[in-house]
């Protein structure tokens, strides 16, 4: 490495340390290791170790760790701090790598889809008398007007999807890419969805991958989970899924809140996320059958107390349940 290159590396490191100090406060320096107070557990001693050479961090008290220092900036820094850190090469390279590994496949086209002809938006002011039935159903699930407007919920009084609430999804271009239907009468088939690929990001335009993302089973769970929640629609998330690609590309922190009876699926997702060093938290859903049964306030409280997962504590937890 030439003198010029070494000088640039030192300058880059100095800029990073200066930014970290602005976000975290004072520090001790031990070679390439910098010790700060941990903003996660707020321990009074400087136990958060940050290694700029390895682009890694770990708190020796609460076990918070990761292989992307930008996580710290994203969670505790300002908008300007985030922008400045992203100007450093590491974050750019991560995004390029993710684009290459998880980017769109050639000739990949999403099947065209549109809402049913009989669809009526429940967000309208003047509604027909038939709207009383889907509105009563939504009310029974504690879903009010704000949710109806936000999720653009409607219904079909007749036709193929007659007697069903309709919740549409939009892709990143604002086009409909899926919709979920749920019967509000006594139809034996509760859900009847279009026969198109579920490899989508439900309501992509409303998801901020730079913030915590909640993964739930169904769309009614997502409504209760609030902002930045994505339903998996009963599908299994894989390394080739569009949603997974965006999570890796943006190094998005994940909060898992799947149904309690989906233990195998939850464990599979946890293993997958930990394999890619995704910051993962587990939300306790029991004794409820799903998030959709909770009040929004209940879910938020549970999210606050979610279990942070690392390879170590996840393995110990699994062994203890054997």
Regions found by a protein language model. Name each.
Residues 1-42, 76-166, 170-173, 208, ...:
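TOPRIM metal-binding catalytic domain and adjacent DNA-binding surface shared by DnaG-type primases
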Residues 16, 157-252, 268:
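Phosphate-handling DNA/RNA-contact segment within nucleic-acid enzymes
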Residues 41-44, 62:
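Short Cys/His-rich metal-coordination motifs, predominantly Zn2+-binding knuckles/fingers
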Residues 165, 245-251, 290-304:
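Short, surface-exposed amphipathic charged segments that create phosphate/polyanion-binding patches used
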Residues 215, 251-265, 283-284:
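Acidic beta-strand-to-loop metal/phosphate-binding motif
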Residues 244, 265-277:
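Short, aromatic/basic amphipathic alpha-helical patches
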């Amino acid at each position: 490495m030439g003198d010029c290159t070494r000088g640039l590396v030192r300058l880059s490191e100095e800029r990073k340390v200066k930014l970290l100090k602005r976000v975290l406060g004072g520090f001790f320096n031990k070679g390439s290791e910098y010790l700060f107070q941990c903003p996660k557990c707020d321990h009074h001693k400087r136990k958060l170790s940050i290694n700029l050479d390895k682009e890694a961090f770990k708190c020796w008290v609460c076990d918070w760790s990761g292989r992307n220092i930008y996580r710290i900036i994203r969670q505790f820094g300002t908008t300007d701090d985030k922008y400045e850190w992203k100007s450093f090469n590491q974050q750019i390279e991560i995004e390029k790598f993710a684009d290459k590994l998880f980017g769109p496949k050639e000739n990949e086209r999403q099947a065209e889809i549109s809402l049913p002809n009989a669809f009526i938006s429940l967000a309208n002011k003047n509604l027909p008398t038939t709207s009383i039935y889907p509105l009563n159903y939504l009310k029974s699930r504690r879903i009010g007007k704000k949710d109806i407007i936000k999720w653009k919920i409607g219904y079909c009084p007749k036709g193929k999807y007659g007697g069903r609430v309709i919740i549409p999804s939009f892709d990143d271009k604002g086009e409909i890419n899926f919709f979920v239907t749920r019967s509000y009468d006594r139809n034996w088939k509760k859900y009847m969805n279009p026969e198109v690929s579920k490899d989508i990001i439900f309501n992509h335009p409303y998801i901020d991958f730079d913030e915590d993302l909640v993964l739930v089973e169904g769309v009614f769970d997502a409504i209760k989970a609030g902002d930045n929640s994505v339903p998996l629609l009963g599908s299994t998330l894989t390394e080739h899924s569009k949603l997974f690609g965006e999570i890796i590309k943006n190094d998005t922190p994940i909060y898992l809140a799947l149904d309690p009876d989906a233990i195998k699926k939850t464990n599979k997702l946890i293993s997958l996320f930990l394999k890619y060093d995704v910051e993962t938290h587990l939300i306790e859903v029991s004794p409820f059958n799903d998030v959709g049964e909770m009040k929004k306030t209940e879910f938020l409280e549970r999210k606050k107390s979610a279990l942070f997962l690392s390879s170590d504590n996840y393995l110990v937890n699994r062994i203890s349940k054997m």
